[in-house]
Curated annotation (Swiss-Prot):
Name of the protein this chain belongs to: Kunitz-type serine protease inhibitor conotoxin Cal9.1b
Propeptide: 1-2
SUPFAM superfamilies: BPTI-like
Protein's UniProt keywords contain Disulfide bond: yes
Keywords: Disulfide bond, Protease inhibitor, Secreted, Serine protease inhibitor, Toxin
């Protein structure tokens, strides 16, 4: 997978309950959104900052 491939993945919150605020790219809207990540598992469509999300997936 390339870095851009993660932009196509749906956000997965994972099964844990840490409630970490992260950003994920929403391919349907074409925007990065703030979401809650559980802290374990999930996939690569998860970014610590909006800037990281935008830099990876903007204009995708």
């Amino acid at each position: 997978r390339t870095k851009r491939d993660v932009c196509e993945l749906p956000f997965e919150e994972g099964p844990c309950f840490a409630a970490i605020r992260v950003y994920a790219y929403n391919a349907e809207t074409g925007d990065c959104e703030q979401l809650t990540y559980g802290g374990c598992e999930g996939n690569g469509n998860r970014f610590a900052t909006l800037e990281d999300c935008d830099n990876t997936c903007a204009r995708y």
